């Protein structure tokens, strides 16, 4: 369960339990930056369930780190704590006009192509695509998602095709790339690694024109 910060959603515990209700044997990982401390009554609902916390430590920015650790220990919830380190610059939205082989390489190198995202009734495999579409920063292309509210008779087949995608999505051409190792990636067009918690200044308010 990822965000932003998932604990900002008041129903985060309810959502997590809903995922586990579908398959009680699975393990759910909740990613947090320890800016918000979960409530005791929320953590109590995970008793006997496979819930783990993955805590990214941003030093002073993770202002509730001690409280979060104390709460997780109190409720015997496993956690993993890791320093934030660096971010990969991949925030710009722009059309690259890549060839098909280059698009396949972008997709091959991507670390976010299996981060399934449900937004406004549409299922995506990539949070970049879902958020760019929500901002209307990229053209609406039905090949990028599955509309779960559609009246299609072959919805299951569409979902299966989406999650098994091996080539690329049309929206990949608007992405700088999300490689595991930007220094080695062949098709990465961002600015490399930046210190976690720091933002790259943007000269204009929006780096794209709205698509309609």
Predicted regions and their residues:
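ER/Golgi luminal nucleotide-sugar-dependent glycosyltransferases, focusing on the catalytic module
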Residues: 212
């Amino acid at each position: 369960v990822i965000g932003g910060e998932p604990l900002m959603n008041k129903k985060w515990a309810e959502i997590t339990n809903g995922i586990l209700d579908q398959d009680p044997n699975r393990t759910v990982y909740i990613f947090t930056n320890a800016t918000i401390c979960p409530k005791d009554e929320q953590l109590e609902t995970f008793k006997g369930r496979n819930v783990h916390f993955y805590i990214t430590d941003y030093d002073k920015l993770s202002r509730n780190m001690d409280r979060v650790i104390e709460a997780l220990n109190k409720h015997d919830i496993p956690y993993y704590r890791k320093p934030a380190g660096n971010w990969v610059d991949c925030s710009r939205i722009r059309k690259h006009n890549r060839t098909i082989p280059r698009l396949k390489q972008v997709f091959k190198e991507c670390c976010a192509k299996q981060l399934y995202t449900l937004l406004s009734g549409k299922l995506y495999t990539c949070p970049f695509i879902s958020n760019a579409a929500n901002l209307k920063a990229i053209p609406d292309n039905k090949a990028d998602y599955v509309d779960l509210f559609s009246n299609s008779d072959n919805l299951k087949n569409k979902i299966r095709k989406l999650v098994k995608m091996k080539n690329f999505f049309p929206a990949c051409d608007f992405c700088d790339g999300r490689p595991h190792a930007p220094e080695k990636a062949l098709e990465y067009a961002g600015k490399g690694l930046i210190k976690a918690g720091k933002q790259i200044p943007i000269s204009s308010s929006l780096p794209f024109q709205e698509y309609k």
